[in-house]
């Protein structure tokens, strides 16, 4: 839930106007909107590069994943792994635009550990792939923008652990 929605819901639940503190938080949210959109646009425009490079790094670091018997062995399973990385990158962009982790949590992280466990997917490898995406993505951004984006990647990585 964005800071705007959260503030309005809280104020309405108490039948009051928005407080000066809530208005300040909304003002900050609005003033950082252009930056958040710029970050999301950069990640979106570079998504293929980010996912491919992260996948290459993951498979180099974890060759067991793409070896016979590995969860991403074979062309089809490797493509499935890259599709999952792309999915998490998309969720990260949603969080960045919203300025909040709620879309990430509600759309894509509920039950994710259970799903991967049931499929026999090594969760540490998924987290490693997301960490690699974070590194590739952040290399495309300024230090300030990378810090902003990095926190959303970290949230997803944390959910995997």
UniProtKB/Swiss-Prot annotation:
Keywords in alphabetical order: Antenna complex, Bile pigment, Chromophore, Electron transport, Membrane, Methylation, Photosynthesis, Phycobilisome, Thylakoid, Transport
Residues that, per the record, bind (2R,3E)-phycocyanobilin: 81
Principal localisation: membrane
Membrane topology: Peripheral membrane protein
PTM (free text): Contains one covalently linked phycocyanobilin chromophore.
Gene behind the chain: apcA
Family: Belongs to the phycobiliprotein family.
Database matches in PANTHER family: ALLOPHYCOCYANIN ALPHA CHAIN, PHYCOBILISOME 32.1 KDA LINKER POLYPEPTIDE, PHYCOCYANIN-ASSOCIATED, ROD 2-RELATED
Annotated S-S bridges: none
Taxonomy of the source species: Bacteria, Bacillati, Cyanobacteriota, Cyanophyceae, Acaryochloridales
Subunit comment: Heterodimer of an alpha and a beta chain.
Location(s), subcellular: Cellular thylakoid membrane
Protein name, as recorded: Allophycocyanin alpha chain
InterPro entries recorded: Globin-like_sf, Phycobilisome_asu/bsu, Phycobilisome_asu/bsu_sf
GO cellular component, one term: plasma membrane-derived thylakoid membrane
GO-annotated biological processes: photosynthesis
Residues found modified as N4-methylasparagine: 71
Function: Light-harvesting photosynthetic bile pigment-protein from the phycobiliprotein complex. Allophycocyanin has a maximum absorption at approximately 650 nanometers.
